[in-house]
């Protein structure tokens, strides 16, 4: 961690017109926190949640909208407790209106198909825990039961890892750990009453993380490759290891966020300890691949400084969020460095004009195989579209801000 401490100590400490709060100073009831500022910026850009992620009013059960609305809901819930005591119903209504539109009175989820066995479709279910707590609407609980039922039947690799999707047989992508495991853990903690079954689920969750770590780990870098094909049949994978070619920044960011979110949910014990160890190993390797000038991370994580590579906002926001939260949970060291990383995240990627926050340099999408035969080589990753305010960056930016504001 020494190298990144030096890097981040030299980073710019104020962010392009964004007024940063001072750690430990509680905002007044009328003072807007940065996390709220980001939420309001998005709500002003997109007055209805069906317009998030470029969907232009299309109703769709998708992880990107669900991810961002989960962050909105976290801002809403934290604002309601001390020291803020602020009930911002506009945020709640914005979130609830989308979920009420996409889930009918019986708990049927619009355009959801269990037979797709997509881990992406589990992710939007996380906000349902909060909505159910706040409203008591049975349809939210029914929808959660549907998603949990999918996980009970999710196809698995020979080692027991969840397939990423039905269309990607025997493949585990780092993305999928975030999509499924936090929901899996929270459902078990809340609703699985049988202690033996709950314990078995916790063990299964740990197994998912360990399996994908073991099979995507690159011994030369200490980083994790984007994905692994247990069958060794995909054109994009190494014929011996099954690994994809590169460590993609956001893929590792998903994995780190999944770790801290699940660690927070697990009771003390072997599984929590093992997941904490995985997180610590990652944060031992990450500083070596940070940009020396900013401390932020590249689109293709294992090729820092290579021609065409660029500092990428979504991955950097995910790493900063997971670092701050890991420190709060007592499983990562480096509070001062994590705080500096947050400042650098804002100074590198965030601008503000007229109270509207913009997050720049977000990779829109990246994957492997599929109908576009995505190869996962270096040129593929650096040539995917880059845009502002991608939900996969906005959500982690909000969570990083919330963690910083709790210091």
Where are these regions (language model features)?
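Bacterial Sec-dependent N-terminal signal peptides
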Residues: 1-26
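CBM-like carbohydrate-recognition segments
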Residues: 9-10, 27-66, 78-81, 85-92, ...
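Extracytoplasmic/secreted envelope proteins and their assembly/folding machinery
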Residues: 39, 72, 128, 148, ...
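Secondary-structure edge/capping motif, primarily at the C-terminal ends of alpha-helices
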Residues: 75-79, 263-266
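Extended ligand-binding groove/face enriched in aromatic
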Residues: 93, 102-238, 373-374
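Extended ligand-binding clefts on enzyme/binding-domain cores
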Residues: 174-175, 181-302, 309-320, 332-378
């Amino acid at each position: 961690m020494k190298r990144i401490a030096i890097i981040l100590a030299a980073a710019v400490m104020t962010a392009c017109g964004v007024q940063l709060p001072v750690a430990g100073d509680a905002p007044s009831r009328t003072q807007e926190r940065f996390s709220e500022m980001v939420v309001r910026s998005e709500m002003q850009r997109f007055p209805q949640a069906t317009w998030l992620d470029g969907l232009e009013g299309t109703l769709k059960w998708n992880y990107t909208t669900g991810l961002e609305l989960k962050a909105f809901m976290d801002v809403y819930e934290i604002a309601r407790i001390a020291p803020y005591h602020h009930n911002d119903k506009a945020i709640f209504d914005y979130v609830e209106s989308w979920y009420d539109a996409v889930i009918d009175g019986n708990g049927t989820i619009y355009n959801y198909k269990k037979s797709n066995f997509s881990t992406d479709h589990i992710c939007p279910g996380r906000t349902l825990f909060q909505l159910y707590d706040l409203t008591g609407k049975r349809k939210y609980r029914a929808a959660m039961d549907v998603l949990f039922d999918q996980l009970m039947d999710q196809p698995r690799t020979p080692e027991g890892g969840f397939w990423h999707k039905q269309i990607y047989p025997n493949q585990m992508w780092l993305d999928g750990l975030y999509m499924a495991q936090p929901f899996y853990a929270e459902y078990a903690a809340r609703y699985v009453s049988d202690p033996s079954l709950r314990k078995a689920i916790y063990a299964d969750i740990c197994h998912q993380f360990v399996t994908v770590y073991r099979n995507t780990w690159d011994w030369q870098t200490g980083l994790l490759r984007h994905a692994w094909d247990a069958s060794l049949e995909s054109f994009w994978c190494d014929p011996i290891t099954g690994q994809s070619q590169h460590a993609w920044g956001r893929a590792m960011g998903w994995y780190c966020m999944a770790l801290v979110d699940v660690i927070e949910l697990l009771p003390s014990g072997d599984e929590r300890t093992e997941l904490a160890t995985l997180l610590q190993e990652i944060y031992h390797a990450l500083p070596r691949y940070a940009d020396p000038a900013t401390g932020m991370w590249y689109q293709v994580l294992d090729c820092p400084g290579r021609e065409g590579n660029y500092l990428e906002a979504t991955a950097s926001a995910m790493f900063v969020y997971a670092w701050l939260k890991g420190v709060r949970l007592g499983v990562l060291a480096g509070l001062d460095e994590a705080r500096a990383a947050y400042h650098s995240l804002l100074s590198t990627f965030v601008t503000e004009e007229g109270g509207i926050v913009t997050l720049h340099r977000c990779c829109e999408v990246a994957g492997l195989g599929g109908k576009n035969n995505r190869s996962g080589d270096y040129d593929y990753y650096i040539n995917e579209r880059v845009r502002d305010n991608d939900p996969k960056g906005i959500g982690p930016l909000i969570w990083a801000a919330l963690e910083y504001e709790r210091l």
